[in-house]
């Protein structure tokens, strides 16, 4: 593992997408260095940007444990904000392991990305044995990475250190496992979401693909057509909207100075 002094670490940028924190850089560390850097800076993942022949940049994403997810919605929005500020334009395209995405930088309070996929791969899974208060069935949907969505009357008192790993490693979702979202319906088109993230192996303040998964599952169940507001566990607000068959995720992005 390379030696990282405070001055070396300061060469990276720290971004937050609606509370989801990332280290962003244009040099690629070794996997063990990714784990170290994420631990030192207390972030959820590492974003590596490199030149691309088909987009403004290619984004390679690492979880804090060094694993590589194919997509991270808030990480992608952070990359879009970074590229917009570097290139001096608002229209940004990014190539990822999950495909080519386009986004738009309106302001630091509103960074949008088109998250549309041809197939969301939604499926219902029955849990024969489960701890309370998990329901008999959960929905799994693929929003670039797999997510299980559990709708419950109240989620603020849930112990995600128990319920999260139970579903994340459940044999139903083997061998790769899933991210797990616990969803509370606050009102029409208003959701509160808590997410246990695969690769972080814990709850995060927000999760973009999890917010998207939760909104898609609930809107399909209740027939909602309007934009859905997601109240994250960290207190930020995200919005999922649909227009002419396209699905958009938006929210704030901040950069630590």
Curated annotation (Swiss-Prot):
Source species: Chlamydia pneumoniae (Chlamydophila pneumoniae)
GO cellular component: cytosol
Coiled coil residues, start to end: none
Active site per UniProt: 72 (proton donor), 207 (proton acceptor)
HAMAP family referenced in this protein's UniProt entry, alphabetically: DAP_epimerase (MF_00197)
Pathway the protein acts in: Amino-acid biosynthesis; L-lysine biosynthesis via DAP pathway; DL-2,6-diaminopimelate from LL-2,6-diaminopimelate: step 1/1
Cysteine pairs bridged by disulfides in the record: none
Residues that hold substrate according to the record: 20, 63, 73-74, 179, 197-198, 208-209
GO BP terms: lysine biosynthetic process via diaminopimelate
Compartment annotation: Cytoplasm
Protein function: Catalyzes the stereoinversion of LL-2,6-diaminopimelate (L,L-DAP) to meso-diaminopimelate (meso-DAP), a precursor of L-lysine and an essential component of the bacterial peptidoglycan.
Record flagged with keyword Cytoplasm: yes
Catalysed reactions, semicolon-separated: (2S,6S)-2,6-diaminopimelate = meso-2,6-diaminopimelate
One Pfam family per UniProt: DAP_epimerase
Family from the record: Belongs to the diaminopimelate epimerase family.
Superkingdom in the source lineage: Bacteria
Chief place of localization: cytoplasm
UniProt protein name: Diaminopimelate epimerase
Organism ancestry: Bacteria, Pseudomonadati, Chlamydiota, Chlamydiia, Chlamydiales
Catalytic activity, EC: 5.1.1.7
Keywords, in A-Z order: Amino-acid biosynthesis, Cytoplasm, Isomerase, Lysine biosynthesis
